[in-house]
Amino acid sequence: MASEQENTADFGFRTVARDEKEVMVAEVFHSVAAKYDLMNDLMSFGIHRIWKRFTIECSGVRRNQRVLDLAGGTGDLTAKFSRMVGEGGEVILADINASMLKVGREKLRNKGIIDNISYVQANAEALPFPDDFFDCITISFGLRNVTDKNKALRSMYRVLKPGGRLLVLEFSKPIIKQLSTVYDAYSFHILPRIGEAVASDAGSYRYLAESIRMHPDQETLKGMMSDAGFDSVNYFNLTGGIVALHRGFKF
């Protein structure tokens, strides 16, 4: 008989049933999809582009490889990977949320980025791909929204080729006390107001702030990746630990 903890999950600071969380997270991203890119620029003052560029640099992706951009949303990383793998490679943009996938597809097609990209609606906990399929997997600002993170990490490990690498770019825990104080004030008081003003949705951005606080810290996530089977797991603190990039290999 499953324990109460096994049947529940965090939705921000609230504890909800696991299946309820998936529905609630879906509603958040259906709501924010149309304004997602604009809000990313406003919320991070454009710094998210630097974080993503660093992720690309750490990916080791080469021509003719196959890449999974998981929880790929509006396709920022997919666009870069598409050019890196070339005509002989493939990038799969996967997202559980149909609205985000639609925005990403339209954005990339409007930029003329078409030929080597596929779009798949997929749950990170049960990826619909064969074993040992991808040379590289990235999940950017998506893992904290997954209900069962350990299950998702195991699923990523399964579909990654031996010699491949996983990159997890995610909000984390500031390593400077003064920065943490300022960051909390910004996240809980200013961010929801920006969400209300720009996207008419303070609630979704309040969830964003809460979900960041509930996400595992740097060392905990490193341990989770190791437990899922990844080797040589390390991480890089970015912007004082506001964001961390975790990298693990499958040998």
Curated annotation (Swiss-Prot):
Look up keyword S-adenosyl-L-methionine and say if it applies: yes
Q: Which InterPro entries match?
A: SAM-dependent_MTases_sf, UbiE/COQ5_MeTrFase, UbiE/COQ5_MeTrFase_CS
Gene Ontology biological process: aerobic respiration; menaquinone biosynthetic process; methylation
For S-adenosyl-L-methionine, which residues are the binding ones? 74, 95, 123-124, 140
Q: What domain of life does the native source organism fall in?
A: Bacteria
Reaction(s) catalysed by this chain's protein = a 2-demethylmenaquinol + S-adenosyl-L-methionine = a menaquinol + S-adenosyl-L-homocysteine + H(+); a 2-methoxy-6-(all-trans-polyprenyl)benzene-1,4-diol + S-adenosyl-L-methionine = a 5-methoxy-2-methyl-3-(all-trans-polyprenyl)benzene-1,4-diol + S-adenosyl-L-homocysteine + H(+)
Enumerate the UniProt keywords alphabetically.
Menaquinone biosynthesis, Methyltransferase, S-adenosyl-L-methionine, Transferase, Ubiquinone biosynthesis
Q: State the family it belongs to.
A: Belongs to the class I-like SAM-binding methyltransferase superfamily. MenG/UbiE family.
| Role | Methyltransferase required for the conversion of demethylmenaquinol (DMKH2) to menaquinol (MKH2) and the conversion of 2-polyprenyl-6-methoxy-1,4-benzoquinol (DDMQH2) to 2-polyprenyl-3-methyl-6-methoxy-1,4-benzoquinol (DMQH2).
Q: What is this protein called?
A: Ubiquinone/menaquinone biosynthesis C-methyltransferase UbiE
Q: Which organism is it from?
A: Pectobacterium carotovorum subsp. carotovorum (strain PC1)
